[in-house]
């Protein structure tokens, strides 16, 4: 199975759920040990996952704010809400706009190395889903959206769970395992 781990981070940046999935070593004889099942790595502690979630939350916020803006045409409308001035006063400074004004500004959406691919999905409520998979796995965006749908059904609709609290719901764990292992 090419899915290594799933982390869910609240809008405040705290880790509310993490789960690693069993992987096998290249010989296939027994499960590999270590972070994400990679050889030569150590297993992360719960504290390490908390630090990882907080760090990623900060980096995601920074990358969301450094989305580049390009100079707007002189013929563009002066009341365009996606355009801003360099000095922020609306004076004679040149105008700048986002590359695609109608598209929402996002942070990191995907990151890939030779060992894993990180796919990120941020819901409208600000909850971030981090999915670590094998780099050769196709359609990780569809997979992470399917995970989000099950999260909405089994966690968000649970009357005993409150937003930003840790997720400890057996029905969610079962639905997640069934979705990932029956694909």
Positions of predicted regions on the chain:
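Intrinsically disordered, Ser/Thr-rich regulatory regions of eukaryotic membrane-trafficking proteins
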Residues: 1-183
């Amino acid at each position: 199975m090419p899915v290594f781990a799933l982390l869910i981070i609240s809008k405040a940046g705290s880790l509310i759920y993490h789960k690693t999935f069993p992987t096998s070593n290249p010989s296939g004889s027994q499960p590999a040990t270590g972070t994400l099942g990679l050889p030569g790595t150590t297993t992360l502690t719960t504290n390490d996952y908390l630090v990882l979630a907080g760090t990623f939350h900060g980096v995601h916020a920074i990358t969301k704010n450094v989305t580049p803006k390009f100079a707007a045409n002189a013929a563009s409308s002066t009341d365009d809400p996606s355009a801003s001035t360099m000095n922020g006063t609306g004076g004679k400074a040149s105008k700048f706009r986002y590359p695609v004004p109608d598209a929402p500004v996002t942070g990191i959406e995907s990151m890939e190395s030779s060992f894993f691919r990180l796919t990120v999905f941020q819901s409208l409520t600000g909850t971030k889903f981090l999915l670590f998979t094998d780099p050769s796995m196709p359609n990780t965006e569809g997979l992470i959206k399917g995970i989000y749908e099950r999260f909405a059904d089994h966690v968000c609709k649970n009357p005993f769970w409150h937003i930003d609290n840790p997720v400890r719901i057996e029905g969610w764990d079962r639905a997640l395992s069934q979705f990932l292992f029956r694909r």
